[in-house]
């Protein structure tokens, strides 16, 4: 923030006690009596926060009712049995018959995304996709786990999380035909949601490949330049980004005399040598590579 008086950048600070924004360079008061949107209490640990908090958690698409529900407590209840019965009744009426399918799918999604150690924003993206699919009736006649896996894989691509398709297929024993059928439904729904287009690029996979093959960073730099050039020229369309990145790393490592065999590269990434060879051929057929000594 720039001071309107002395025009100094990043010199404005907030005085919490007086509620004023002050310039540290010229001492001008930019604004006084500023409203503090934070809580009216202070907490120094988790216990303090739990005792003083008077509001619930923020809304989230990971829960069928977006988190807007009532929880009946029994900490100070005189009749514990009556309170317990009320809790059970409240839990039953909280989910309407039409929401049962959504509750089941979101429960599976939250469990599996935690097992895969995916970040919260990926879970929320997948939850929004699943909600839209339930609304449009695209969750019928399809295996629930296959649908969840497809939604999580697509959400990783939307949020620039480089996770390979093979990781999901091997973990859940899903056939290629089942997965692509589910992914087709996910893509159909995601196209109707603004901002839900895949943003990931082939170069995102290269750090993982370098780590698994124990290669120096310079190879990653050159391999990234190569796959970025292919991506800009439209040569990556319809090709697996992981295998394309792996082939570029294989080629650059060979040119820099830090050789890795195709088998070593393929085995470290759970892909076939044939895939590496095909992507390698795509690279050398489209580029004239000149090595300057």
Swiss-Prot record:
Zn(2+) binds at residues 3, 6, 23, 26. GO terms for cellular component: transcription preinitiation complex. A zinc finger (TFIIB-type) spans 1-31. Keywords: Metal-binding, Repeat, Transcription, Transcription regulation, Zinc, Zinc-finger. It comes from the Archaea. InterPro entries: Cyclin-like_dom, Cyclin-like_sf, TFIIB, TFIIB_arc, TFIIB_cyclin, Znf_TFIIB. SMART domains: CYCLIN. PANTHER family: TRANSCRIPTION INITIATION FACTOR IIB (PTHR11618:SF13), TRANSCRIPTION INITIATION FACTOR IIB-RELATED (PTHR11618). It holds the Pfam family Zn_Ribbon_TF. SUPFAM superfamilies: Cyclin-like (SSF47954), Zinc beta-ribbon (SSF57783). One of its GO terms (biological process) is transcription preinitiation complex assembly. This is Transcription initiation factor IIB 2. GO terms for molecular function: DNA-binding transcription factor activity; TBP-class protein binding; zinc ion binding. Strain 2-2-12 is a substrain of P2 that is highly susceptible to infection by Sulfolobus turreted icosahedral virus 1 (STIV-1). The keyword Plastid does not apply. Sequence repeats lie at residues 107-193, 204-285. Stabilizes TBP binding to an archaeal box-A promoter. Also responsible for recruiting RNA polymerase II to the pre-initiation complex (DNA-TBP-TFIIB). It comes from Saccharolobus solfataricus (strain ATCC 35092 / DSM 1617 / JCM 11322 / P2). CDD domains: CYCLIN_TFIIB_archaea_like_rpt2 (cd20550). Induction: (Microbial infection) At least 4-fold induced following infection by Sulfolobus turreted icosahedral virus 1 (STIV-1) in strain 2-2-12. Belongs to the TFIIB family. The gene is tfbB.
């Amino acid at each position: 923030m720039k001071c309107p008086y002395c025009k100094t950048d990043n010199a404005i600070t907030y005085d919490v006690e007086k509620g004023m924004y002050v310039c540290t360079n010229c001492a001008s008061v930019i604004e006084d009596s500023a409203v503090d949107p934070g809580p009216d209490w202070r907490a120094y640990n988790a216990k303090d926060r739990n005792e003083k908090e008077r509001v619930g958690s923020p809304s989230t698409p990971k829960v069928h009712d977006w988190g807007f529900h009532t929880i009946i407590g029994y900490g100070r209840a005189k009749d514990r049995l009556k309170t317990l019965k009320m809790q059970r009744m409240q839990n039953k009426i909280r989910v309407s018959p039409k929401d049962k399918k959504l509750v089941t799918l979101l429960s599976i999604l939250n469990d599996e995304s935690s097992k895969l150690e995916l970040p919260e924003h990926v879970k929320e993206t997948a939850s929004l996709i699943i909600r839209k699919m339930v609304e449009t009736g695209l969750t019928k006649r399809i295996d629930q786990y296959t649908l969840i896996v497809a939604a999580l894989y697509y959400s990783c691509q939307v949020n620039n999380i480089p996770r390979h398709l093979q990781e999901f297929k091997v973990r859940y024993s899903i056939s290629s035909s089942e997965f692509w059928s589910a992914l087709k439904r996910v893509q159909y729904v995601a196209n109707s949601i603004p901002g839900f287009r895949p943003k990931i690029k082939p170069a995102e996979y290269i750090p993982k490949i370098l780590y698994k093959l124990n290669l120096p960073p310079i190879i990653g730099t050159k391999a990234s330049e190569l796959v970025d050039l292919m991506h800009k020229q439209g040569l990556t369309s319809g090709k697996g980004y992981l295998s394309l990145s792996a082939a570029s790393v294989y080629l650059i490592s060979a040119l820099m005399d830090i050789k890795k065999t195709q088998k070593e590269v393929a085995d470290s990434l759970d892909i076939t040598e044939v895939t590496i060879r095909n992507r390698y051929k795509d690279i050398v057929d489209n580029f004239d590579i000149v090595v300057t000594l």
